[in-house]
Amino acid sequence: MGKASRDKRDIYYRKAKEEGWRARSAFKLLQIDEEFNIFEGVKRVVDLCAAPGSWSQVLSRKLYLPAKLSPDSKDSDLPLIVAIDLQPMAPIEGVIQVQGDITNARTAETVIRHFDGGKADLVVCDGAPDVTGLHDMDEFVQSQLILALKLFFTEVTFAKPKSSRNSSIEAFVVCENYSPPEGFNEKDLHRLLEKIGSPSGADDLDCSSGWLEGPNKVYIPFLACGDLNGYDSDRSYPLPKSADGSYQSLDPVQPPIAPPYKRALEMKKASSHGTQGLEKLSLDP
């Protein structure tokens, strides 16, 4: 009953299982592509925070498999897809997996080696930074992210896919036309990280919001993605019934292999069994 209830309440969860996606988030990337056409001309792509792999599935189906099935395709012409996550992920055809930290320079060097020294045409990420719970600090950190993106891309847009619930306070930043500042050197980032990592480095940073006022204040356009006549992620839909009037719920395509919450679930299950054991003992004569 529980599975059928969720299938009814979450149409994208149900459609993901029916279409073979590992998670409903696959539709978010598909709807972003419908609006921005981000896959056009892409030969090298990186998927950050990839597990359990629904976005990597989209990349494989949209980029790798069509090229592989083309009669004129050559191995050297096939798109290269690299997926990165701290957690292990089940294999996906055409996707190179790297288990590592996306903030580590060595991980970036590993990706570039897979690209034979080339740079990525597209980087996608369905991950979010941890929040501190201190709203002023979180807002400052997010403003720093927006500033960094505006410095490196000429077009920055907030996109809200239709498969993203209205009740979910999330949006995706779509950045186009990579154009780094004049004189920018990638090694500058390494020096900056080394400075911030030093005991006194943080003391040199201006964490006030005053510099964001006046001419420095930036407004980012917000755009809804997806067919307005498509499925509504906040609405319940009737379940498709078979000839005998029954409904069979499908299992998830590929559950996470080693999710970070696995230990918590095991402890909860063990605690529940312990409580049931105590209740049984108390009822015995």
Where are these regions (language model features)?
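S-adenosyl-L-methionine
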Residues: 74-80, 84-130
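Conserved S-adenosyl-L-methionine
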Residues: 59-80, 153-165
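Residue-level signature of catalytic and energy-coupling elements of molecular machines
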Residues: 29, 49, 97, 123, ...
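SAM/dcSAM-binding transferase cores
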Residues: 2-23, 35, 172-285
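Class I SAM-dependent methyltransferase Rossmann-like catalytic core
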Residues: 1-44, 55-61, 65
